[in-house]
């Protein structure tokens, strides 16, 4: 299909603040904000334009509506485990994004003279192509990004000078 093929962006969203739950409420309170574009649009768009499109899907009314739809599907399903918040995901093409950048983990002090953390990372990834995690911001405002790529995609991305100008491979 080439540049007309549609790519979906799934953005994990903590729905607690949208539905009035306490931020420490136990349980899985995650839904996905969904955005899509053709590959041609993605390739020709500026990063800021794509980011704005994704952020628009984080609007309160949209999150509440989509979460209510998901809750209704779960409620009506005979097998609650069969309900999938990414039902049409094609991991070879689509992107799943989760951001922990707002969490102030580097401000935490472990006490006992240990001080603040040197690094904050997500536990080992489940290998799922197209999965992206933005880690908590460091004290200087940097953000570590975890990407799950195929080996051949990784080999290509590290050879891309324009990409590597903005990042450093650490693992």
Which residues make up each language-model segment?
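Acyl-CoA-dependent O-acyltransferases
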Residues: 1-171
């Amino acid at each position: 299909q080439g540049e007309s093929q549609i790519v979906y962006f799934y953005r994990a969203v903590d729905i607690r603040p949208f539905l009035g739950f306490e931020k420490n409420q136990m349980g899985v309170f995650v839904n996905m904000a969904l955005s899509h574009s053709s590959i041609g649009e993605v390739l020709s768009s500026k990063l800021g334009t794509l980011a704005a499109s994704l952020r628009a899907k984080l609007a309160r009314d949209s999150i509440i509506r989509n979460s209510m739809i998901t809750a209704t599907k779960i409620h009506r399903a005979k097998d609650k485990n069969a309900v999938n918040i990414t039902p049409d995901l094609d991991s070879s093409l689509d992107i799943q994004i989760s951001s922990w950048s707002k969490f102030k983990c580097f401000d935490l002090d472990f006490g006992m003279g240990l001080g603040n953390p040197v690094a904050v990372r997500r536990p080992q990834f489940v290998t799922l192509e197209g999965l992206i995690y933005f880690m908590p911001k460091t004290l200087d405002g940097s953000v570590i990004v975890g990407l799950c790529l195929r080996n051949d995609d990784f080999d290509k991305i590290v050879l891309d000078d324009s990409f590597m100008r903005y990042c450093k491979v650490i693992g």
